[in-house]
Curated annotation (Swiss-Prot):
Organism ancestry: Bacteria, Bacillati, Actinomycetota, Actinomycetes, Bifidobacteriales
Cofactor note: Binds 1 Mn(2+) ion per subunit.
Disulfide pairings: none
Record's keyword annotation contains Coiled coil: no
Gene Ontology terms describing biological process: L-arabinose catabolic process to xylulose 5-phosphate
The organism of origin for this protein: Bifidobacterium animalis subsp. lactis (strain AD011)
Protein name: L-arabinose isomerase
Function: Catalyzes the conversion of L-arabinose to L-ribulose.
Binding site for Mn(2+): E308, E335, H352, H453
Annotated SUPFAM superfamilies: FucI/AraA C-terminal domain-like, FucI/AraA N-terminal and middle domains
Family matches, as NCBIfam families: PRK02929.1
Reaction catalysis annotation: beta-L-arabinopyranose = L-ribulose
Family: Belongs to the arabinose isomerase family.
Amino acid sequence: MAMENPFEGKEIWFGVGSQDLYGEEALRQVAQQSAEIVDSLNASGRIPVKLVLKPTLKSSDGVRRFMVDASADDSCIGVITWMHTFSPAKMWIRGLEALRKPLLQLNTQHHFEIPWETIDMDFMNLNQAAHGDREYGYIVTRLGIPRKIVVGHYTDPAVADKIGVWARACAGWQASNTMNVMRWGDNMRNVAVTEGDKTEAERVFGASINTWAVNELVAAYDAVKENQIKDLIEDYKAKYEIAPELLDKDYDSLFIAAREECAMVNMMRANGCTAGVDNFEDLGALPQLPGVGPQRFPSEYGWGFSAEGDWKTAVLVRIGAVMGYGLEGGASLMEDYSYNFTPGNEMIMGSHMLEVSPSVGTIAKPRLEIHPLGIGGKADPVRLVFTVAPKKDAVVVSLADVRTRFRMLMNVVDVVEPLGSLDKLPCARALWKPEPNLEISAECWLRAGGSHHTCMTTSVGREAWEDFARIAGVELAAIDAETTPREFERELEIEDVFHELANRH
């Protein structure tokens, strides 16, 4: 089992601006040098999606056709624009207003340094990105079109890295817009932050969130063939340490857990879903609250999963899994549980009763175990037990419905090793030190109304989520090393005013 490559068959279109004023020879050089730039970026190995150079854009009609075609082509997940020469910005208006794909403005040039001894007006006319990109940047800003801006010579690895992160965010955006979320049951009773406007979520994120009766999952459970279950158990044996009792007296429990995973996967695939949620209060005739199956959703299938009906976090986990494809680490549901206030070692323990995924990286091989669970009213569930491996500059991301809009909240964190063995804790767990410190992080998180459920990503960090939020047009409040409570509170107040004005009709 392996996650499908979300970048395969996808493209980012590269549009270069100029105008007919410069003549045939200059435009020939523009096309040639543009091809060299795109070839170099593609060869860098830092951008997971192929860049495709399109014919030089020299007129309003040409720009509009380029943008309309990009918007209509499902293989195109984003557009990069660069002005090799001066390109009058009025000719970009109709095209930019027709664009429905993420946009990146690249501010680069073909030459690395000014040719001090030979530069003449022919060179100046041909190489004036510093001129043309300012004209173009003005019109994009005037039109209010969100875009990422990357500045630097195209041979600089940092430039390719920034484009690569943005390309991952573009893939996350496409995954969001094609996402079907399967809810087995509804929200956990009386819980507030996991609720949300599913209709508005489809408008904003493109994700379709719907409910399937738990009885349908029970029927799928009954229909699973024995050979599928046994094949899955062999996969467990290959990837995890297994507690001896699960291969002996408790083998039936392992068989049931594998059967539940098969049923969930079969239903998800049959309905084209890439994220799912369940609720321990609504299990019908299922023998166990699903544990190992949901834990494997991100790591084995690239799907999102969250518990207790929390579809918003499931959406984030799917987006995080797509953005981080091919990188070390991954994405998982996480939940803030307990603080460590020891001076110098202030940290947060995150966990969940069953569903944290090993996709985020583990210190040792995950171990399949069986333990009692005091909620759900079902048989003892089988789950993977592990500790998340240390990782600097990871992030935890929350999505909350704050009445008038969705707010994404992100904290940059360093995942660290625990200070003890945690031998008696029968669930997956992570320890992290939040930036700038525990006190300020927690105060700001509470101030912003952040959820106790988050998506932890150890593959992509802050920049990818910032790019995603910009593409989605969603507020992102970030807590990092520079955050102070006073400034953070002011930023939230400014966001409130901004969105209040923006939502007036």
